[in-house]
């Protein structure tokens, strides 16, 4: 028996509020908007307003974001290149790929992967468009959440999408396997007229009528049309899904890097300019005998220092300077922390442009690439399953019998970076081993499955044209010599 939609919306809205806060926090970390720690106690910045302002300014300058490359280097390598069915496991299907490209997913899939890698989850909604064909959209993880059946990580119970439209009203859509319920807040968010305690949270919901649609809208497919891409999911089933950002395990290292940079900036502020000292100097004083700081000699690049020694002690006047601070330890500590981030996150060091990768042996670089390829392969298992389910639903929407295929596999591009020569050699080896021509063609960089099939068709056409233009082969048999008459 299906749960009351408003009760279900109330539960899912509360979880979506928690999820939206976590998503916003993860996106801030990725964007470099890191939380600023409070000033240490017993320091002027903890009590004095001006000192606190200076501390906050310096802390914002100290943010040195090393989290972005962890996500970017993975996202750039995750490129779906087609889908295979159990009936044709050696080639990709052009029909489902046409649906994929018609929905601009050859570009927009990057948005879903980026959202999942940054925040732990991304979402895809599939539903018929106005023309009856499958329409696939990428959704913001702050606005969508999926509820799963208890004990399952795959059986979707319901999904919720919430957003504020241009008119200021809150819109909520509940997706279930039987129907789709569309609501709108009774008041605009710009009026502040909310009713606390309602299922929608701080606003009252009322059914939203859409022209030429029944309410609720029947779901003829018997399946929730919202699909979740989860990055690094837990083995424990979660009622509301979700994953873990790629950089979640190295946030402490990022905090340490920011703190190290902060200390370096403070040292630069106070010790980068060489401090000078003077002995035997008759410094100016006030009437009470205290040093006259206003008349003191001030050091500067455009200033000439003129000093008056004590009477009769001219030979004791000395001027010197302290050595400037050594900032190399700060750089070394930062590099050590970044190396720790590489190890913990499985990100190759070259993603951070570390200087110790100069003249790295090819075997060592291959091992670094292997770490990256393993991480990408693990992500592709989770993401690929979601894309396969979404495309199966799209085929169902369009009445394609291939939706009944029990095995739909997402085909990914190469996870390892190879030179064009290496890739061409690999393709030639595959050809020598008897691989189909479409597989050989698709191994060349930048060649999509549809392009590979076009190459195959043109290659066959060229062979036929060449055969037709070739001179005719004379198939007239050689004359048979006469049999000599037998003697006698």
Question: What feature does the model see in each segment?
Answer:
Residues 444-475:
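Long, highly charged low-complexity segments enriched in Glu/Asp and Lys/Arg with interspersed Ser/Thr
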């Amino acid at each position: 028996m299906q749960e009351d939609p408003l009760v279900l919306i109330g539960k899912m809205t509360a979880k979506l509020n928690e999820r939206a806060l976590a998503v916003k926090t993860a996106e801030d970390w990725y964007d470099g908007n890191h939380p600023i720690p409070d000033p240490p106690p017993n320091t002027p910045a903890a009590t004095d307003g001006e000192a606190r302002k200076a501390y906050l300014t310096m802390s914002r300058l100290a943010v040195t974001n090393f989290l972005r490359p962890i996500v970017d280097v993975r996202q750039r390598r995750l490129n779906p290149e087609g889908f295979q069915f159990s009936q044709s496991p050696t080639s990709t299907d052009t029909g489902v790929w046409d649906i994929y490209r018609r929905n601009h997913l050859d570009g927009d899939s990057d948005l879903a992967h980026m959202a999942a890698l940054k925040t732990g989850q991304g979402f895809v909604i599939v539903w018929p468009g106005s023309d009856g064909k499958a329409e696939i959209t990428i959704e913001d993880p702050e606005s969508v959440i999926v509820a799963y059946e208890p004990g399952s990580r795959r059986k979707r119970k319901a999904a919720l999408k919430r957003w504020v439209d241009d008119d200021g009203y809150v819109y909520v859509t509940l997706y279930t396997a039987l129907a789709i319920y569309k609501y709108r807040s009774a008041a605009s968010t710009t009026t502040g007229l909310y009713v606390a305690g309602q299922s929608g949270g701080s606003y009252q919901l009322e059914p939203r009528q859409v022209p030429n649609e029944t309410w609720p809208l029947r779901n003829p497919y018997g399946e929730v049309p919202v699909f979740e891409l989860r990055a690094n999911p837990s083995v424990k089933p979660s009622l509301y899904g979700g994953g873990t950002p790629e950089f979640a395990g190295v946030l402490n290292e990022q905090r340490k890097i920011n703190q190290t940079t902060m200390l370096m900036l403070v040292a630069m502020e106070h010790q980068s300019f060489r401090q000078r000292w003077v002995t035997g100097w008759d410094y100016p004083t006030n009437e009470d005998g205290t040093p006259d700081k206003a008349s003191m000699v001030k050091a500067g690049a455009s200033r000439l220092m003129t000093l008056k020694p004590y009477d009769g002690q001219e030979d004791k006047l000395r001027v010197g300077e302290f050595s400037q601070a050594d900032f190399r330890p700060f750089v070394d500590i930062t590099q050590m922390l970044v190396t720790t981030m590489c190890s913990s996150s499985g990100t190759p060091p070259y993603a951070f442009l570390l200087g110790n990768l100069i003249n790295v042996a090819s075997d060592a670089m291959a091992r670094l690439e292997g770490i990256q390829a393993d991480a990408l392969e693990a992500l592709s298992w989770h993401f690929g399953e979601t894309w396969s389910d979404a495309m199966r639903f799209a085929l169902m929407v369009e009445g394609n019998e291939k939706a009944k295929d029990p095995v739909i596999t997402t085909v990914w591009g190469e996870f390892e970076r190879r030179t064009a020569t290496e890739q061409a050699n690999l393709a030639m080896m595959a050809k020598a081993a008897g691989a189909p021509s479409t597989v050989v063609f698709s191994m060349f960089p930048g060649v999509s499955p549809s392009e590979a099939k076009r190459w195959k068709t043109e290659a066959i056409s060229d062979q036929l044209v060449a055969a037709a233009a070739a001179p005719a082969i004379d198939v007239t048999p050689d004359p048979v010599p006469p049999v000599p008459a037998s003697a006698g």
